């Protein structure tokens, strides 16, 4: 199957290009039209011979304007109050309606998936409760990570992202801090799988977060 890459910003699309030979790549950062031109994007990839697409990297939602027929279809399906997840679901539905399959980054490069088990050191507690909190937060479509500080304090990720959450934890003088990050239960992991990497680890170390727990197989480990 000929797979094309729709590349947003960040490390993930760069890593994928290093690991996977894509039939065609479209860099959304240099795409000359607004991202509302969904039909044009789809036609470009199909004309290049792509039978499936991998969507990877961050995209500025503010560029979703000047809708063409495909963009209008996506906007109407998602609804006027749609969050990022609903918009992505509608985008996937459009591509699939046009006969283009969607492949996740973790599918085209399975080694990126966070493996089960303890990667370094030793784990002396059951991480289930922290992961449950992270999933509950994700179910509210707010964030994907929580940090347990000391005995009773929990910090929750918001729209500012995981690194901002970690910085907030650095302001808490607790001896023990643990980060938990999990996929949102409702999210389509083909296009929206949570990521982590050296930047996450460095930020955590600086903030005094000594233990990092990531949901196995449902998060991507970058540059590790």
Segments the model singles out, each with a brief description of its role:
Residues 2, 6, 11-13, 81, ...:
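Conserved mixed alpha/beta catalytic, RNA-binding, or beta-rich assembly cores of soluble enzyme
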Residues 5, 55-56, 181, 214:
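Redox-cofactor binding/interface segments in oxidoreductases and associated redox assembly factors
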Residues 23, 101-102, 211:
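Hydrophobic beta-strand scaffold residues
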Residues 1-47:
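N-terminal glycine-/serine-/threonine-rich phosphate-binding loop
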Residues 7-12, 58-61, 219:
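Gly/Ser/Thr-rich loops at beta-strand to alpha-helix junctions
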Residues 38-109:
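N-terminal glycine-rich phosphate/adenylate-binding segment common to multiple enzyme folds
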Residues 29, 33-50, 67-80, 164-224:
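Feature captures the catalytic cores and cofactor-binding loops of soluble hydro-lyases/lyases
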Residues 13-19, 54, 203, 223-224:
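A short acidic, amphipathic alpha-helical/loop segment
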